[in-house]
């Protein structure tokens, strides 16, 4: 494996312990057991000094730490970014309320915003956020922008699709470094990609084996 990436942006296909959550995820993409995700040799993709930015859900805090460590990273913060999930039509309804004068003060606006956050499952409170941890290998990466904020408000896209804004903020945070998105679904300028739903993969990533696709095809 010749390609080494300084920034690895990952959205693992977590498997859930209950039938409802696991079934909902599996309806849209293939989930994987933790042990199988750990066996993917992400450590072969990572540069000596690199950053892992990885999504996880509130039910998988410990699993996320274990996975980062299995890939050779040390978790620095569990809340690099927090995505506040808005309903898909939140923009239309909020704009309508503002236009029609339904919002008369700051607290009206807060009530409206809270009403438009997604209501997911939960055994205690109902979940409406998802977090991205940041972990480092070696010395990590130098922060290029000191004004990048943690919280991202963004409507839901397709099932489990993450906001483009987070990828953009990572670019601002760490600069123009070699970067790859794993378990990717769509391409983005300046990024390499790997995943069974992306059109073109930069690498072939199998348990115990990472292969540069371009090098393989040229051989």
Where are the regions that the model predicts?
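Class I S-adenosyl-L-methionine-dependent methyltransferase catalytic core
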Residues: 1-219
